[in-house]
């Protein structure tokens, strides 16, 4: 998906779901278990999300927005949360480089904490599904600036190098997390890259 389309989609949802730009959004709770110079390690609990799988050419963003806008079995309007996340779905039977190039994208909106898999309204669109994102440890690098692939790849590589240097095992691909509305100045933006890791808290304090 091109940078232009990504930016257009981000503008679309934040414009429709906010009346101001200082609005506080709920985000999944986590504990910071260790801080390094350029990244931190967080521990998340299980989280409920609404998810769609889509190709690079056909964004599924609008279908997730329709779900929180009322395209669900209760016709509920669900409050926006942050972050919006994107990752590549990896087919483990093929080489990683090939699956990243030809793979599917996953986009997720996290639901407010009051919802569970049992009480959350079901999507009316079969392309959209409710999923429980299992908790665990994630290495996270924060960065500001525009939401471009170049900016993402620069910090992805930085996080990957830091994990290798600290001998921390991680699972590709990285997850792109976006927190801000479209009119936030680039230097004030909160962007993150998250990487699922194997981490032993007892032996890493």
Locate the predicted segments by residue:
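A solvent-exposed interaction/effector surface
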Residues: 2-6, 12-205
């Amino acid at each position: 998906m091109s940078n232009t389309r990504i930016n257009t989609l981000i503008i679309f949802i934040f414009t429709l779901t906010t009346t101001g730009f200082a609005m506080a959004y709920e985000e999944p709770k986590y504990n910071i278990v260790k801080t390094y110079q350029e990244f931190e390690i967080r521990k998340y609990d299980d989280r409920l999300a609404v998810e769609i799988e889509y190709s690079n050419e056909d964004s599924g963003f609008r279908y997730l927005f329709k779900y929180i806008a009322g395209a669900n079995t209760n016709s509920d309007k669900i409050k926006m949360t942050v972050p919006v996340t994107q990752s590549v779905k990896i087919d483990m039977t093929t080489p990683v480089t090939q699956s990243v190039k030809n793979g599917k994208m996953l986009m997720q909106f996290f639901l407010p904490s009051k919802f569970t898999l049992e009480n959350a309204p079901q999507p009316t669109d079969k392309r959209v599904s409710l999923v429980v994102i299992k908790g665990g440890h994630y290495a996270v690098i924060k960065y500001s600036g525009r939401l471009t692939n170049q900016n993402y790849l620069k910090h992805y590589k930085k996080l990957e190098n830091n994990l290798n240097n600290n001998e921390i095992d991680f699972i590709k691909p990285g997850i792109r997390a976006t927190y801000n509305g479209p009119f936030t100045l680039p230097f004030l933006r909160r962007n993150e890259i998250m990487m699922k890791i194997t981490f032993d808290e007892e032996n890493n304090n």
